[in-house]
Swiss-Prot record:
A zinc finger (NR C4-type) spans 13-33, 49-67. Its main location: nucleus. This is Nuclear hormone receptor family member nhr-65. PROSITE patterns: NR_LBD, NUCLEAR_REC_DBD_1, NUCLEAR_REC_DBD_2. GO terms for molecular function: DNA-binding transcription factor activity; sequence-specific DNA binding; zinc ion binding. Residues 132-398 form the NR LBD domain. It comes from Caenorhabditis elegans.
Amino acid sequence: MELEPCSSSPERCKVCGDTGNGMHFGAFTCRACAAFFRRAASRKFLRKCENHLIFALKCKNCRLQRCYEAGMSSENFQFCRDLIGAKGAIPKLKVPKSFEQTVGRPYFVLQCDPEVLFLRRNIIDCVPLLEKAEKLIEFGSESPVFSKNRLLKLAQGLQQFQDAKSNQVKFVQKMGQKEIMSFFETDFLCATKWFTYLDEFQFLDKNQQLTLMQGIWHVWSRLHKLAVSAMGRRRGICDKNTVMVSHQNEFAVCDLNEIEVDMSWCTNFSNEQMRYFLDTSHDSYVYQVMDEMLGLKPNDVELSYMMCQLCLQYAGQRFQGEILEFCEKMLGFLADDLHSYYVKQLRMPNYAARLAKLMKINNRIKVDMLKMRQRQEISRVFDIWTIDFSHPEFIQDANAC
């Protein structure tokens, strides 16, 4: 039995005449022509062929023109059918914000009412204090004072601030506005009085003198407080948990970890919330450096040099200009005086090791001042104080308490 050939022949591609595959973009074509049209129809540079009078399959323009004539259209293109490409972008995992980041406030002031931050601020007038300082500068040092050099004269002037005129010792258990402002005034005037023993200080302009003292009084006070506390421990006036200062005509002793500080006059936050900004704990630099101070036992000459080195270097870096020139010049003179004191009076030519230990104490105080500056920046950002000083130079880098 013979098979009869199929009467129906396969349909041809309407573009190239080859065996067709199916409907593609509106016309029955082969897969090759369908792929060609899919690529060529989206290109702008292909246009009607002007080189061939008859159809040429190898000519892209002719082939594209034949596709259009066969009924193929780019409107039949389908997009975004790729399952991989059609997937949406995977969202990035984000760490959830903390409550502090959400409200924009640090954890230690979260429980405070934000409205209290916008109350009227009180101004502390420093003009009367500056007037007192002007009188001290005009009066000058106690006379007559005869010394071989500047450093020895400063050491003589320091003695009047080391001892209190009265033998009474006052134990301070609470500090409020009255006590804090009293200590502030005493420290500033004592530092001003002491610098009048430096003859070159009198050569500065009056404004420069006051500017210098506004910047360095708290630096002088830090080292002076440390020296008086060390003296108190050696004499048995205070123990290892207390700090002693020479205040007016008497000694004042307090335990920084136990003292009660009333800050309601300068802030609306509680003492617990303000603890970070106050130097009232056993973490204070006084406790950290006290052992080194007791071990070295610097005399008045060495202590005077430490104060000048600490204060003048700080002032030069802060104010620049003529004050910087003055500070560098004085530091050079005082270094020569200290060398002469060690070599000629103490007969100690190899004093480098001892001087390095003294400067180590100064460096520890500088580190503490840097920490205080960072705390002040934080307090300024969050506007925690309700007071302002008429002369802000007084409190830059100074202890809050």
